[in-house]
Amino acid sequence: ACFELSRFADSLDAHFAIETGPETSATLKKFLDSLGSTGVAVNLDPANLVMVTGDDPAKAVYNLRDYIVHTHAKDGVQIFYKDPEIVYGIKKDPLVTGDSFEEVPLGEGSVKWDEYLAALNDIGYKGFLTIEREVGDDPEKDIGNAVNFLKGYMD
């Protein structure tokens, strides 16, 4: 199905972007390479990488450089490692309970923003950097703070 989807996107000179999440960037790259197309591409979410797999977002940028068409500005921390199949409800394990990660305001988590943004610049990424804030008591305030945080890298 993804092979057909990638070819359809190619025929439209478009991309279907899949968001990073339960897999490492190496696993995702292997899958995307198997399609032989960039019709199925990547929305790189650095927080999902650090929260779920513990993957380094800057290394993911270099690894997925040929496929990145969009990226999020989101931050988080991994509290403990939990199999991604358990995180996303594919498998159950009654012995593994509790939240294994937490989304936090931009700049307060484990994403190394200087390295991540430098990597995006190194590969020539010129697309959007969309602020995503899914939780928190005051998302509007968090988004405003995120704008200010990112401006510090763009001055």
Region spans (language model):
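A general structural motif
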Residues: 11-13, 37-39, 66-68, 124-128
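Active-site acidic/histidine proton-transfer and metal-coordination neighborhood
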Residues: 1-42, 51
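Short alpha-helical
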Residues: 23-26, 111, 137-138
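A structural alpha-helix within SAM-dependent methyltransferase catalytic domains
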Residues: 3-6, 10, 29-32, 36, ...
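C-terminal helical cap(s) of enzyme catalytic domains, especially alpha/beta-barrels
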Residues: 139-155
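Active-site beta-loop-alpha junctions enriched in small/polar residues
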Residues: 14, 19-23, 45-49, 73-78, ...
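Conserved, mostly hydrophobic/aromatic
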Residues: 16, 45, 71, 106, ...
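Gly/Pro-rich active-site loop or hairpin
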Residues: 50-125, 140-144
